[in-house]
Amino acid sequence: MPTIYRRKTPVVRIGDVWVGSDAPVVVQSMTNTDTADVDSTIKQCIALARAGSELIRVTVNNDDAAKGVPHLVDGLAKIGIHTPIIGDFHYNGHILLKKYPDCAKALAKYRINPGNVSIGRKDDDNFKAMVDVAVENQKPVRIGVNWGSLDQQLLAKMMDQNAKLAEPKEARDVMMEAMIVSALNSAAIAERYGLRKDQIILSAKVSGVQDLIDVYRDLAKRCDYVLHLGLTEAGMGAKGVVASTAGLSVLLLEGIGDTIRVSLTPKPNGDRTEEVLVAQQILQSMAIRSFTPQVTACPGCGRTTSTFFQELAERIQNYIREQMPQWKTRYTGVEEMKVAVMGCVVNGPGESKHANIGISLPGTFEEPKAPVYVDGRLMTTLKGDKIVEEFTTILNEYVDNRYAKKAEEAVGV
């Protein structure tokens, strides 16, 4: 597999999580609860953290939300969850961070949108006020530019300058440039006010895939700040998953991006953790990181008129997901395990041999038996109506025998 060479950046510490080129690409998420409702926000943070989110962002939009942040962080710590909590500020962050110092101290990072803090205007020092609090508390900051809330004064100025050119650029290109200028100018001002380069993360979010790729390629060439990747609004369902994957994977393959968020729109009362799982799957599918054993299963065709292989694949995948909270604390490297559940003789044996453990179920008109391969070799052949239970037992034994010794060595047993 080709090596991905990460773009060189400083490393930013966010709580106990490191983000930058010398650290793994970090998965983050954001709550959609009212932060002032501390109990509901704690509940959602627990779900996101247990799903694997390594950073969690919460909205801090009013006094009650700011008052709730310390209780949120303390409540999570009491149950053993120390995932860094990031405060998302718009319009009034300079007021809230000054007014509620306990909130400023409890948060692990502040997100500032330069498009709505009037940065650069002579009569407005809101941005400086927020940076001053970050410097005082030694907190990192993400300067997050969004095309939907871009500094209109800056954009208008650049549009006017463009209109005077002999060959004006397209409006889309001017907007992309304005986003980059906003991010870089804001970062330079933040450094003048006392933030170090290893305390600054930049993002320039749009909602179109090609726009995302273009703006981050250009931004990456023009600075060495840590970069946060993501579409500002990916959308719902398959559209959101595909758009995020298409955009992020191109940039990640080029070594661009140090932390990612997949901004999926959940269904009403839907599961917020889906965005975490999709982000993890993007990284794992690209062999950038490993989070959980991967189950390979064929899509099925006319040779597989039975649904049994589909049912087995689903049951094994669900079983692995259920076991992972225990497995990852006991077994070193289990997240890299590959399991194959195949439906006929065409690709079944070959795919199973390439996996750590695989089973090739019989297709239509094939002999009713299922060979099981372990580390490329035929181990046994299963028959009858206990295939699920027997294969699960083999899987458990493989995990225990293959990965337990590493865990014992790691703890010095």
UniProtKB/Swiss-Prot annotation:
GO BP: isopentenyl diphosphate biosynthetic process, methylerythritol 4-phosphate pathway; terpenoid biosynthetic process
Any one GO MF annotation of this record: iron ion binding
Sequence positions that bind [4Fe-4S] cluster: C298, C301, C344, E351
Top-level lineage group: Bacteria
Keywords for the protein's UniProt record, in alphabetical order: 4Fe-4S, Iron, Iron-sulfur, Isoprene biosynthesis, Metal-binding, Oxidoreductase
Protein task: Converts 2C-methyl-D-erythritol 2,4-cyclodiphosphate (ME-2,4cPP) into 1-hydroxy-2-methyl-2-(E)-butenyl 4-diphosphate.
Catalytic reactions on record: (2E)-4-hydroxy-3-methylbut-2-enyl diphosphate + oxidized [flavodoxin] + H2O + 2 H(+) = 2-C-methyl-D-erythritol 2,4-cyclic diphosphate + reduced [flavodoxin]
Needed cofactors: [4Fe-4S] cluster
Family: Belongs to the IspG family.
Listed EC numbers: 1.17.7.3
Gene3D superfamilies: Dihydropteroate synthase-like, Sulfite Reductase Hemoprotein, domain 1
Organism: Koribacter versatilis (strain Ellin345)
Matches recorded under Pfam families: GcpE
Taxonomic path: Bacteria, Pseudomonadati, Acidobacteriota, Terriglobia, Terriglobales
Cross-referenced InterPro entries: Dihydropteroate_synth-like_sf, IspG_bac, IspG_bac-typ, NO2/SO3_Rdtase_4Fe4S_sf
UniProt pathway: Isoprenoid biosynthesis; isopentenyl diphosphate biosynthesis via DXP pathway; isopentenyl diphosphate from 1-deoxy-D-xylulose 5-phosphate: step 5/6
Manner of cofactor binding, per the entry note: Binds 1 [4Fe-4S] cluster.
Protein name: 4-hydroxy-3-methylbut-2-en-1-yl diphosphate synthase (flavodoxin)
